[in-house]
């Protein structure tokens, strides 16, 4: 992990600041409509929030004619072209994904990609010397990831952060523009995290500076992939906490500076696939059905749908997210999009304390955007 992140993010993020571009912990995905229109999204999620699954998404049966193209699942280098359009490339040649949980239901493209010419690390092994991991649909492990005889009663056979490494060209949804030197034009930047409550399924930032605040305040419930501890909410700005090569306050200032350089910047959104009900069940089906949310994001980028304006941002109006054919009732959708003012007042207080920890280096514009939301919620 260290080797690939050191230059592609840690060193590159600082180089990007000095040269006027961005090196980000983001997937790049192309969404093609049945009419052949393609929108490219760059999305940043902390560890274990479904980046690889989203990058390799397969449209559900209800979305015949839609196509999803993978350009990258982890890192995006982005620059403004001569017209002020933000464009992205993926500097990596391969995919490096968490393997437990990968199967035909969760990520069919990944299963096809890792069926040959793949390096597996810290997985269990079957009697035939095949790799095995939790939620794999075939085989039985005989040796665990530490090389010991496997006993599933004592814990996972594969390490929770065991990985696959494979050429991106093994992926059936690999985009023919993945290696285009000029990059692809980004329509939307999407942040997200794993939150049981609080964050709605999707909302849009009101402007670029508000979007930078949304990215700066990304938080997720920790998973084994990140820390070995589970369920603790931790701030992970732009999903770059482990990877930013310089002070975050200066990094946010660099993001804010793009507004002075272009009037064509992408719109910024936040998603949360992981909201749960009172019985701790996921409210949203996720996986391929996330395309329905991405379609709303694209509709907003094209100005095709109106939204409700709340203190935290623009939320979908009733009927603008297509849930036809899903087991998602109007009441469930209402829960998914609910914004609890009291919870958000607490959240903004926590975000404020986090931002203040950066002292005088914190950009005034970010402080002002935060204060606007605090006032609107009060």
Cite the ranges covered by each PLM segment:
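Charged, amphipathic alpha-helical linker segments immediately N-terminal to NTP-binding catalytic cores
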Residues: 1-25
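Pre-Walker A adenine-sensing motif
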Residues: 25-33
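Short acidic-glycine loop/turn motifs at beta-strand connectors
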Residues: 32-36, 79-85
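Glycine-rich phosphate-binding P-loop
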Residues: 38-62
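Hydrophobic/aromatic beta-strand patches that form the interior of the parallel beta-sheet core
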Residues: 41, 69-71, 87-89, 187-190, ...
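Short beta-strand-centered segment that lines the nucleotide-binding/catalytic pocket of NTP-utilizing
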Residues: 64-80
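A short alpha/beta connector and helix-capping loop motif
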Residues: 83-95
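Conserved NTP phosphate-binding and transfer environment spanning the P-loop NTPase/kinase superfamily
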Residues: 98-378
């Amino acid at each position: 992990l260290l080797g690939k992140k050191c230059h592609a993010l840690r060193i590159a993020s600082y180089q990007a600041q000095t040269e006027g571009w961005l090196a980000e912990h983001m997937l790049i995905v192309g969404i093609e409509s049945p009419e052949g229109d393609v929108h490219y999204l760059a999305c940043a999620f902390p560890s274990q929030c479904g980046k690889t699954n989203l990058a390799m998404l397969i449209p559900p049966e209800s979305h015949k004619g839609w196509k999803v193209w993978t350009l990258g699942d982890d890192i995006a280098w982005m620059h403004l072209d001569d017209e002020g359009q933000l464009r992205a490339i993926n500097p990596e040649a391969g995919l490096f994904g968490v393997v437990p949980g990968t199967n035909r239901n969760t990520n069919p493209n990944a299963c096809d990609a890792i069926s040959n010419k793949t390096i597996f690390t810290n997985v269990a092994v079957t009697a035939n010397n095949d790799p095995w991991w939790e939620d794999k649909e075939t085989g039985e492990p005989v040796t665990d990831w530490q090389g010991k005889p496997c006993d599933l009663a004592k814990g996972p056979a594969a390490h929770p952060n065991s990985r696959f490494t494979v050429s991106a060209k093994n992926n059936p949804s690999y985009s023919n523009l993945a290696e285009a030197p000029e990059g692809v034009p980004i329509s939307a930047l999407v942040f997200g995290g794993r939150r049981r409550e609080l964050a709605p399924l999707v909302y849009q930032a009101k402007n670029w500076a508000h979007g930078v605040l949304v990215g700066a305040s990304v938080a997720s419930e920790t998973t084994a992939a990140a820390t070995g501890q589970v369920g603790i909410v931790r701030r992970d700005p732009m999903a770059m906490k482990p990877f930013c090569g310089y002070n975050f306050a200066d990094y946010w200032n660099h993001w804010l500076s793009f507004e002075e350089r272009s009037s064509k910047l992408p719109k910024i959104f936040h998603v949360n696939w992981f909201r749960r009900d009172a019985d701790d069940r996921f409210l949203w089906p996720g996986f391929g059905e996330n395309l329905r949310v991405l379609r709303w994001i694209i509709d907003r980028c094209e100005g095709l749908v109106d939204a409700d304006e709340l203190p935290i941002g623009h939320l979908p109006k009733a009927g603008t997210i297509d849930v036809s054919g899903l087991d998602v009732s109007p009441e469930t959708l209402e829960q998914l999009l609910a914004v609890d003012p009291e919870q958000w007042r607490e959240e903004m207080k926590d975000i404020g304390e986090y931002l203040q920890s950066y002292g005088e280096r914190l950009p005034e514009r970010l402080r002002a955007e935060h204060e606007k939301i605090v006032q609107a919620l009060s």
